[in-house]
Curated annotation (Swiss-Prot):
Protein's membrane topology: Multi-pass membrane protein
Keyword entries, A-Z: Membrane, Transmembrane, Transmembrane helix
Record-level GO BP terms: sensory perception of chemical stimulus
Location of the protein in the cell: Membrane
A GO cellular-component term linked to this record: membrane
Gene Ontology MF terms: G protein-coupled receptor activity
Pfam families from the UniProt entry: 7TM_GPCR_Sra (PF02117)
Transmembrane segments: 34-54, 114-136, 150-170, 199-219, 250-270, 284-304
Protein's UniProt name: Serpentine receptor class alpha-23
Encoding gene per record: sra-23
Similarity-based family: Belongs to the nematode receptor-like protein sra family.
Amino acid sequence: MNKTAEELLDSLKCASDGLASALTSVTLKFNCAFISTIVLISYCFSWLAIQALWNNNIFSNSTRLILIVCLLNSVVHQTTVMETRITQIYRSIVFASEPCEILFRSSECEIELYFYYLTNYFSTYSVFSLTFDRLISHYKSKYYHMHQYFIAISLLVLQFLLAILSFYIAYHGVPLAGYVPMCNYYPKMAVHHITINDVRTVVMVSCIIVTGFAYYLSVKSEKQIQKCSYSPGERYSAYENVTTSQSVCILIVLQFSCTMISSFGVNLLLMMQEAVSEETFTKVGAFLPGVAYANLCLPLAIYFKTKLTIQNRKLRIAVMISMYGDVGEHIARLKKSWEY
């Protein structure tokens, strides 16, 4: 039965008129330029974000390590996205008048399949690592600050295993039969692909709720510490917790929004499949790589959030200096208060 299905898919080598028209259209060429621009901008901001994380202690060491690894993963994913677009445009130019040569056989795309979906899943499950990082920092604060790198590495290993498991469920043993317009399309016989996407959506929604709760707890805790504690270390730790939790909330919401816009758009097109031509479906679908947009938002959010937090710190320091004068005056005032 599978062999018959494979043979049937392999026999559909030629692109339909609508699909061939879409693949050779100006819209797809513009899409290649647009996505490539998105990728190149994400490269620049990934480098700036990594530098910002490396040189500043805005986030805890555990969160910084997780974010740096996620940024490196995003670079690999973006490179794969751009490569699939460029090879598609190249083939559409070379075989513009040959609809039976313009499509890619799924077996030709095996390497892209591994890189694209593994990095895609790893990127999605970063929300899992970041959420648990925040939970541990709140509920096991002392342990967290003593073992930050161990916690980060453990969460990253778990994140990688989740990505591998998702890839295994979706594509293990799936015959690479049939033809696809681009190499980032999943094989036509991968029946569990949509199930994995649904699971990822549930994971992201759950992480948004949990991280929002962790942020609420960290804000509440910081207010209490500011009232009751005069320890600079404890007060700064609480402030760092709030800043990190807020940033993680923003990152997860951005990731979810980008992915959901893509999923909603594709699902809407599928629902309207009878009313929408194959040509229109292909053209619009090419502009909906949600993870590619998420991988642009990630470094942008990290970079600008870091800069904003540094600026806020400087303002706080300036306020303190204006209130207490220079350091010498402040020390003298403290000594005087201690004498009484």
